[in-house]
Every structure is written in structure tokens, then in C-alpha cells.
A protein has these predicted regions:
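Short, flexible helix-loop junctions that flank or precede catalytic/ligand sites
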Residues: 1-66, 71-312
Length: 312
């Protein structure tokens, strides 16, 4: 029986009666039927997912199966029953050399004493978390610091030693919130942090608080860097109505990531990542950028970004 861990893909969609795969290298289309030779392994994986769902009642969780970590989302439909959307995570943390950032942005990430938020935006399935994990590991490795990754659910392989530093992982769940996990990270003396994906006001609030004193990496859904800042502020203001000033003072790096399929003829041969990123602190336009964020004039930041000059 051929194993799913032999494949490179984005999502596997399993339901009683069908199995489809999205973004598979070597496929003729972005979404296609799972090849028959992998159906047996997919059936076993679906059974494992169903057991976890029934036992825990979770509708989102991660699991290690056949040496790979998968993030699972459970969907229930009255007519078709239970479906599982299974995101494949990388076998290893992406080497930082493979993250397409400019030299000033690379220096910004490893800059000693740097604090604030490195916010990575993009569409769903664009590889934001993969990039965020690579950024955090590079920061830990170069600065020799203690880092903590707080995820919901865990989908990276960050736990362990990296260079002269170390990363610990905490999973948000029934007995752990982003708030309690962040407090633990502070008590541990961590100086850098990965806080999952910003999907609500509470998570945004924890990210904002942590970025006042720490180097923080997080992700957010957004169609551009401007949209990402707007959404982040919107979430922060659900709890703190005067959040714009704190965001302006703590937003360190803003990045927008896209993923496109690389085709050779009719076959998907791979995936290409592109990142548009800016350091908002170590640049001559810092004061103007802060002012526009405090005013909520995010689209006007295009003027500063187009002519940005770094002072690193």
C-alpha cells in the first residue's frame, strides 16, 4: 500500500465515498481525486481522525500520522455526514535561506534586542505558518534565546534545540488559552514568541500585549499588507478601543505572502512563494508610518512603502 507521506500536497478532503486532494505535486489540476493507490492509507487516516473527533469532540486538532503532522478540520453536514479537511505540514522547518526576504528584512529578524510584531499575512493555504516557524527558529538560533510557540492546534516542528537557543511548544485547548499560555511564556523568561493565527479579538489582544516587550511572530488572513494592518487593528479594537497607538508603536515587520502553482505542461510541478515585506521601525519613514497607522489611514502607507529607506 502506498503511503500519503510520499506525497507533497496542501489539503486532503476525506468523506464517506470520496477522497480529493488539493495542490498535489504531479497532478494535472489543483483539486483532483486522490489516486487509487493511496486510498487505503487515506481510509486509515480518516479512521484515526474520526476516533480523535469522537473521543475529544474537537472540530480542529493536529495529529502525527506515519511520521507527518497533519492539521485536521472537522465538518459535519446533515446529509453527507462527517468530512475531514486535512492540511499537510512540512516534514521539517523550512530553512530560512529558502524564505524569499530581502537582506534588510533578514537582518531585521535577527537584530539583537529587537521587539515588536512580525505579522505575516496571506490567503488560506499560502504557507504563512511555514514561514512564521522558519522566522522564529532563525531568531532563536542566531540570538541564542528561549522561544515559545503557542498554537491552536500545534502544526510545526519547533519544539527542541535550535543553535544556541531552544523552543518550547504550548497547545491552546480546553485547559489552555492564549492568555494563560502567554503568561507561562513570560514566566519562563522567553524573549521571542510565535502566537498562532490571529482570528479573533482575544488572540489579537494577546499578540499586542506580548509585542510590547518581546519579539513576536504571528499570522493573519489578508489580501495585502494594508488589509492585514486593517484587520489586525480591527481585532485589537474589539478589546482595546484605543489600540491604534499601541499597534503603531509595536508593529515591527509587516509581510504579505502568496503561493502559486508551478506548472510544467499540464502537471503541477511545485509551488512558488513570494513575500512582500517591510520593516516599519528601522527606516527613515518611521514617523510617517506611525502617524498613518494611528489615523487609520492604511492605504496611504503605499507612499512610504514605495520609497522605503532602511537605516539598519
Amino acid at each position: 500500500m502506498n503511503r500519503l507521506n510520499e506525497l507533497s500536497f496542501i489539503d486532503l478532503i476525506l468523506e464517506d465515498g470520496f477522497a480529493e486532494i488539493k495542490g498535489m505535486k504531479g497532478a494535472n489540476s489543483y483539486l483532483t481525486d486522490l489516486p487509487e493507490i493511496y486510498q487505503g492509507d487515506a481510509s486509515e487516516l480518516r479512521s484515526v481522525c474520526n476516533d480523535i473527533h469522537i473521543r475529544t469532540q474537537k472540530t480542529e486538532f493536529s495529529l502525527r500520522y506515519d511520521g507527518r503532522i497533519y492539521r485536521v478540520t472537522v465538518i459535519y453536514h446533515e446529509w453527507s455526514g462527517t468530512s475531514f479537511v486535512i492540511r499537510q505540514t512540512p516534514e521539517n522547518i523550512l530553512p530560512f535561506t529558502d524564505v524569499p526576504l530581502s537582506t534588510p528584512l533578514r537582518s531585521s529578524i535577527t537584530r539583537p534586542g529587537a521587539t515588536g510584531l512580525c505579522l505575516i499575512a496571506g490567503e488560506m493555504g499560502s504557507g504563512k505558518t511555514t514561514t512564521a516557524a522558519s522566522v522564529l527558529r532563525q531568531r532563536i538560533e542566531i540570538t541564542g534565546s528561549l522561544g515559545v510557540s503557542i498554537e491552536d492546534p500545534i502544526e510545526t516542528l519547533l519544539h527542541g534545540r535550535h543553535g544556541n537557543g531552544r523552543c518550547l511548544q504550548l497547545e491552546v485547548g480546553q485547559n489552555e488559552s492564549y492568555s494563560t499560555a502567554t503568561k507561562k511564556a513570560l514566566r519562563m523568561g522567553a524573549s521571542c514568541l510565535l502566537l498562532g493565527e490571529i482570528r479573533d479579538g482575544q488572540t489579537a489582544h494577546e499578540v499586542l500585549k506580548a509585542s510590547l516587550t518581546m519579539f513576536v511572530v504571528s499570522t493573519i488572513h489578508g489580501s495585502s499588507v494594508y488589509d492585514a494592518i486593517d484587520r489586525y487593528v480591527m481585532f485589537c479594537e474589539e478589546i482595546n478601543h484605543n489600540a491604534k497607538q499601541n499597534v503603531a508603536n509595536t508593529l515591527y515587520i509587516i509581510a504579505h505572502q502568496t503561493m502559486t502553482s508551478v506548472r510544467r505542461g499540464d502537471v503541477v510541478a511545485g509551488r512558488n512563494i513570494s513575500i512582500n515585506a517591510f520593516n516599519l521601525v528601522n527606516c527613515t519613514q518611521n514617523a510617517a508610518i506611525k502617524s498613518k497607522i494611528m489615523q487609520g489611514n492604511y492605504r496611504a502607507l503605499q507612499d512610504e512603502f514605495n520609497g522605503i529607506e532602511y537605516t539598519l
